Regions:
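Conserved catalytic core of nucleotide polymerization and phosphodiester-bond processing enzymes
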Residues: 1-168
Length: 168
């Protein structure tokens, strides 16, 4: 079933109190916003605050060009600039939670994007270079999770906002 149809159908079953409202929202790019917040990668969060297109920013890093160059060419209808932005989206979705080349290939296929071997190799590398605090956060999460399993009942922090504890 079409997701929009499914949502429209499910909303028919919600009731609201008189004089109360009901809102529906899309948590746009939620996975790309939560991770930098958890990891303290504030420069990335600031791009959202500034209204920047994170996918174009990623693409500029992948293809060693500028945000302005890709944005200008996209506005002019350049299909290669559209491909570059799509690669930036793939990078965000595939690499944010430690995905590598296999994840890039999977997400690229889902986006209908054909990438060269060099692009597939380069996408995770440029992401990791651009987000050192996120990379450190991955290691902190792994370390805290292992320690929690090894030390039943004790709590271990990963960054400022995540705590691991084994209770079983």
């Amino acid at each position: 079933q079409n997701p929009h149809e499914a949502l429209a159908f499910s909303l028919r079953h919600f009731c609201r109190e008189p004089d109360c409202g009901m809102w529906s929202c899309d948590f746009s790019n939620i996975e790309a916003r939560i991770l930098p917040w958890l990891a303290g990668q504030d420069d990335r969060l600031q791009r959202y605050v500034n209204g920047e297109d994170i996918y174009i920013f990623n693409a500029a890093n992948i293809y060693h060009t500028t945000v302005e160059d890709i944005a200008t060419r996209r506005k002019a209808g350049d299909p290669y600039a559209n491909k570059q932005r799509k690669a930036g989206k793939v990078q965000e979705l595939a690499c944010g939670y430690q995905g590598g080349e296999a994840a890039v290939m999977l997400f690229a296929r889902a986006q209908g994007l054909v990438l060269t071997k060099e692009e597939i190799r380069n996408i995770p590398l440029t992401y990791r270079k651009a987000v050192p605090k996120i990379v450190a956060f991955w290691a902190a999460c792994q370390d805290a999770a292992i320690k929690a399993v090894q030390n039943f009942g004790e709590e271990f922090k990963a960054g400022e906002r995540i705590t691991y504890q084994c209770k079983m």
